[in-house]
Amino acid sequence: MKQYDYLIVGAGLYGAVFAHEAKKAGKRCLVIDKRAHIAGNIYTEEVEGINVHRYGAHIFHTNNKAVWQYVNQFAEFNRYTNSPVANYHGEIYNLPFNMNTFNRMWGVVTPAEAKAKIEQQRAEAGITEPKNLEEQAISLVGTDIYEKLIKGYTGKQWGRPCTELPAFIIKRLPVRFTYDDNYFNALYQGIPNSVSSVSVSKRTLRYCNAPSL
């Protein structure tokens, strides 16, 4: 029976990096995962020649140059900038919520105008201390944006009305009073250029005992 220094549960980024560094330090690692594949939530599968993210798009982002250089030893990353948009009955809005969103919604141009509009709608809703997700969202971005871009999506995502969801879920919602459409503020960001996330994980785990290699 083989003896290991570490049993690593989970073959996602954290487990793969730990196993890689432990192996470099001369340790024996066994990596296990309940899923039938490695790479955790960054797992991709090829469909018609395209690497599709099974669990939703995952973009690597960091402000740490050393971390960026570290991951680039396993794959070359492109400079993908995540600038999503939402389509509400033919109306296109930028995400995360920023001045482009507010301008499209209300015709406002300056941050002061946008903040005044949000405050007006918060006051009209009579919200002082948000008690649920709906009230928290209105406090952050106003009633119009909540009704068009948050209510339906979030209710579908969680399977219950926003009035039944706790306020803390949306407290970290990015709201920017600039015209920057970049979802992340990180200096370094991207997706592996020509290889899948699975290939990145395989390269990280290549000297370890792990599933599906």
What function would you assign to each model-found segment?
Residues 4-31:
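N-terminal Rossmann-like FAD-binding beta1-loop-alpha1 element of flavoenzymes
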Residues 48-124:
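Dinucleotide-binding Rossmann-like beta1-alpha1 core, especially the glycine-rich loop
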Residues 39-40, 50-55, 207-213:
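Central helical "cap/lid" subdomain
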Residues 19-21, 43-44, 72-73:
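Short amphipathic alpha-helical segments
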Residues 91-93, 100-213:
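Active-site/ligand-binding neighborhood in enzyme catalytic cores
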